[in-house]
Amino acid sequence: PQEFNLFADQAQMDIFEQYFYDINQFNRVPGNSTEYADMLTLLEEKIAIFKNIKLLNFVDPYYIKPNELYRLGTLETGFGEVEQVTHKEYLNIKLSPLARPTLKRAVFIDTPQGYRIYPTFTNNVQCHYVRKPRKINWGYNVINDTALYDATTSIDFQLHPSEENNLIVKILALAGIAIKDPAMYQIATAEDNKNIQQEKA
């Protein structure tokens, strides 16, 4: 079960991370007016279950990032959206009387310690973000030297139902590598490549 948990988690993250590369690719191509075939709409639907909004904790002078953060969307105060800038941009902005940050036109810098908002703002700040999928756990109890499934400690996949085949193929490929079966790995990789070609066509 432990190997399955590792394979399952890796496969889920591979599929999840691919969504963002695909969005970038499909943003460069004209959209599709067919309601159920527009790839950007389908990708947004797949990511929707991972979108969160959270009030951030303030530990002077930083707003602490959510632990499960994968990609930041926006930060919002009661005055509206806060614009992200680099440290260098902030140094230039604060010197300009017209561009200097105000409560209604705040800016923030993303640092390893958290988000630094200018001007200093200690009220509620909402973070809109995409979270990481939870780690997969095939929960089990060992009874008479046999691992028996335990639903109370298990964490299931969180991907869109349409990803079931991709998930199986990716887990199969990882298992093929682990048991050193090149045929199983090659079959799974060929199937994965076929799926990718169909999606990108």
Regions found by a protein language model. Give the residues of each.
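Glycine-enriched, solvent-exposed interface loops adjoining structured elements
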Residues: P1-A201
